[in-house]
């Protein structure tokens, strides 16, 4: 029996913004990273741009500018075990991991972690 190895190529999209009241990540690549480096206002995260495929991944990294900021989420983001965060913690980095679920057309939050 012959075994053939196939190299799997991943598309990556990396986007960074200092601050926005309506941050809009990208979601059309298999791997997407969206970073907010100094959030200076409350933010409502818009639906990711692009056409996602089932299983696409999106990491959102958020840090405020030294003042806690409110966070809200478009309905396309769906909580799983943990609630979507509603505020930042002053000067702490937060990571949120999402996987696109094409059966429900939702970005399911599968991970959340915050700087200690």
Predicted regions span which residues?
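Terminal beta-strand-rich extracellular "head" domains
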Residues: 76-90
